[in-house]
């Protein structure tokens, strides 16, 4: 899948494919130490103040040491939890089971996601040295390219440039998986080509009028008129936040 490294303002400067660089492998980008990495899907809102909600896919690395403000996975009183490292008191002696390296939000309104991971072999599970409470949450072997890219010929990946969507926890340097084949709809999160520039916004229709909606009060909403050249370049199928780069 091609990678547009110049970013989408939240644009990249031109729709030309000249801005596409080499293809990107999400497994290589998001999983640095495969034998020490596990992936799970959040069953509830684990850390909403950091934008980690139910159904998010979370990638943890067991081989790296946590740094200040890293999000860590730990268990306490028989419960699996996430917390910022160093942000809470009373964590002395708590067993840390992994550092969050990436989080993935899938746009389930746009795509039917049929996720069938391969089972981990017993020896692979034992190498992770995890308690049962964590083991039972692991998805198994997953190919992030297959999970996140349903239509490879029509999909590209780009990086967010700016903070106009930070109210939805979509921030500067986050990755976007964008599918040009998906149909747009009221309320969709889309990469829009407006009057010669790209921008990332929600597309809302109110009384027959189209609006491009930011998620930051510092940015105005944009009313689309007949004189505007607006094209929906693609629908955001997933947003990837790299907690460790």
Predicted regions and their residues:
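Hydrophobic beta-strand signal
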Residues: 59, 73, 177-178, 191
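Structured core of small recognition/catalytic domains
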Residues: 160, 166, 171-179
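Short, positionally conserved secondary-structure boundary motifs
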Residues: 1-48, 53-54, 64-68, 75-166, ...
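Surface loops and adjacent helix of pleckstrin homology
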Residues: 63, 85-86, 170, 181, ...
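Short acidic low-complexity segments
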Residues: 60-66, 178-184
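Structural motif
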Residues: 55-56, 70, 173-174, 188
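A general secondary-structure boundary signal
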Residues: 187, 209-214
């Amino acid at each position: 899948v091609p990678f547009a490294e110049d970013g989408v303002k939240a644009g990249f400067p031109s729709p030309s494919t000249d801005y596409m660089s080499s293809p990107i492998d999400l497994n290589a980008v998001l999983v640095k130490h495969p034998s020490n990495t596990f992936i799970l899907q959040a069953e509830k809102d684990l850390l909403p103040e950091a934008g980690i909600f139910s159904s998010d896919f979370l990638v943890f690395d067991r081989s790296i040491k946590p740094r200040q403000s890293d999000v860590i996975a730990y268990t306490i009183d028989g419960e699996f939890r996430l917390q910022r490292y160093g942000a809470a008191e009373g964590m002395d002696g708590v067993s840390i089971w992994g550092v969050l390296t990436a989080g993935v939000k899938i746009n389930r309104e746009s795509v039917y996601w049929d996720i069938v991971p391969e089972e981990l072999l017993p020896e692979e599970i034992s190498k992770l040295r995890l308690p049962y409470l964590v083991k039972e949450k692991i998805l198994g072997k997953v190919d992030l390219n297959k999970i996140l890219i349903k239509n490879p010929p029509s999909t590209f990946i780009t990086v967010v440039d700016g903070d106009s969507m930070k109210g939805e926890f979509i921030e500067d340097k986050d990755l976007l998986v964008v599918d040009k084949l998906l149909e747009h709809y009221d309320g969709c999160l889309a990469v829009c080509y407006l009057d010669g520039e790209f921008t990332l916004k929600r597309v809302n229709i109110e009384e027959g009028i189209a609006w491009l909606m930011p998620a930051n009060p510092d940015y105005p909403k944009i009313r689309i008129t007949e004189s505007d050249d607006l094209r929906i370049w693609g629908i955001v199928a997933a947003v990837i936040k790299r907690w460790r780069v």
